[in-house]
Amino acid sequence: MHYIVMDLEWNQSPRGRAGKCGDMPFEIIEIGAVKLDEQLQEVGQFHEFIKPAVYRQLHYKTKEILNLDVKELEQCRGFKPVIQDFLDWCGDDYLICTW
């Protein structure tokens, strides 16, 4: 079994709650992860930014924390192919750990 220690970065409406899109207050724009074996030794890394589909402008705090510009994200792939690659990278026997 592998342990997948992952971190997600999120964006939200640049207008805060007033601009929230239905039941989707946040959108994943980055997936980062480290794969550990059963001895907790690192055996792989995954990192990819994701092109926003819902909130195409960055919230000011997201921009500040990640030091990103939305133009950089526009060049990235969308969520579906990225999450599929991530799940393929995880393998068949894994446990996801996050905070």
Language model: regions and residue ranges:
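Conserved non-catalytic scaffold segment of RNase H-like nuclease domains
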Residues: 2-99
